[in-house]
Amino acid sequence: MPTLLLSDIHGNIVALEAVLEHAAKEGYDRVVFLGDAVGYYPDGNAVVEKLRSLNARGVMGNHDAWLLTLDVLEAEGYVFDILRWQADRIEEENWAWLAELPWKIDEGSWLAIHGSPCDPLVYVDELEVAREAFGCTEARWAFHGHTHLAGAYTALDGPNGPWVRHRPFTEPSNHLKIGPKARVLVNPGSVGQPRDGLPQAGYAIWHEDKDELTAYRVEYDIAAVEERVRSAGFPAPLYQRLYQGR
């Protein structure tokens, strides 16, 4: 069953629609969402609406959780100003869908979480953190987001603990196949705000029956997002960073 993996969309409906158009040509049967539907860009409601229409299974991201708890958060800054703006525009059904997201999906052979399997708010962005993360799950395939960095950590058991290496996904198409004794921690990349120096939206399609995955990078109309950001009165760096992939 081909599984479409989406993460860190952050209200960027333009990027999401481009990804879905590309993914439809590749083919998929189900959608797993790795958190952060909202935040940063104006179309959080439309993003959640689209995820609901896809019958996506999803997990909670930190921005999703912040939006749901704004009434008790004592936080300032543009990140939270944007979330307050979005909260006023999220429809009731979409709010309810976000509120029901779990922090983790654990199916035994595979796991979905926003951050580390050890803690959904931890960034898996270093080898030592990844090594610890493998110790918190027995899943062969673990999927996460949060860092906005597309790539995979692969682990093999060694005499002094797991041997771990990292591979970034920087090509338009990045194929990954694992052996029977390997385990992986995969970040499909950010749909809405990549931070690895590449402006293209990231996503992946996983073939569980073949023990393989392909991660893709997709061009989209960043200028259209810039227009949406300007119209909403959000800070200019939010669209400027999209052109740089930072």
Question: What positions do the PLM features span?
Answer:
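Glycine-rich phosphate-binding loop signature in dinucleotide/nucleotide-binding domains
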Residues: 23-28, 107, 136-138, 179-180
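Hydrophobic, aromatic-enriched interface-forming segments
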Residues: 136-160, 165-166
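Beta-strand-turn-beta hairpins that frame and shape the catalytic cleft
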Residues: 1-4, 105-112, 179-184
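Active-site environment of divalent metal-dependent phosphoester hydrolases
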Residues: 10-14, 39-41, 63-68, 106, ...
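Acidic, His/Gly-rich catalytic cores of divalent-metal-dependent hydrolytic chemistry
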Residues: 157-246
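Active-site neighborhood of divalent metal-dependent phosphoester bond hydrolases
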Residues: 47-48, 53-138
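N-terminal active-site segment of His-dependent metallophosphoesterases
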Residues: 1-56
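Active-site neighborhood of phospho(di)ester-bond hydrolases with catalytic His/Asp-centered motifs
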Residues: 6-7, 31-36, 57-62, 113, ...
